[in-house]
Amino acid sequence: MSKKINSAILFCSIVLTYSCSITANISKYYSENQKILDSIQHSYNEQYRRRPFSIQFTDKTFTNVSIEIFTDSLKYIYEFIISEARMKDTLLKYALPVADINKLISQMASIHCTWINNLDYYVNNKKESLIYMSIRAKPFNYPFTNKKYYILTYFLQPQYYDAEGRLLDRRYRKKIRKINEDVFKRITDKVAYTISDRFR
């Protein structure tokens, strides 16, 4: 019995240490990369206002990119090798600025951001939006888990968090808000994170 108790205590200590390590690593990562992360968020937000779209890298070398472009009634999905002429022609067709999109794609590749999109959610029956970024990199391939993606969410308004830093529903402030079934934690008032086994 004593051995079982000691094993349980040891396991809990490992889990607690592991959890603290994740939080520390992600906070450090955000601090070190805040300038480029914020630049990606700002650039994507600006271009999204012109035409709703999302960007996804489809290979581990970050050379193939899929762009989803939304019109009033349809969604078009295109896949390109970065900088091929066909991508430029497609961006021009939908009135998206080629240089700005190329820069955004380059910035995403530099930090292994695999996907960026704009997601809608509702507060008091009012539609709000957030920017959702998925990042896959070696620092987040943690042991004891199959969760490989670091997810960042950028909100337009400051959010509510509980004492443990978990994102709360703005309407029911004691209720944990999940995004894509994941619980998010605070980085800043407007930026939250989670780690996940899926990028979207």
PLM regions: where:
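N-terminal export/targeting and maturation segments
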Residues: 20-105
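Generic hydrophobic secondary-structure signal
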Residues: 11, 37-40, 187
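Generic preference for well-ordered secondary structure
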Residues: 4, 21-24, 88, 171, ...
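Bacterial Sec-dependent N-terminal signal peptides
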Residues: 1-30
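Generic detector of ordered, mature protein regions
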Residues: 14, 18, 43, 50-57, ...
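Extracytoplasmic electrostatic interaction patches
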Residues: 84, 92-200
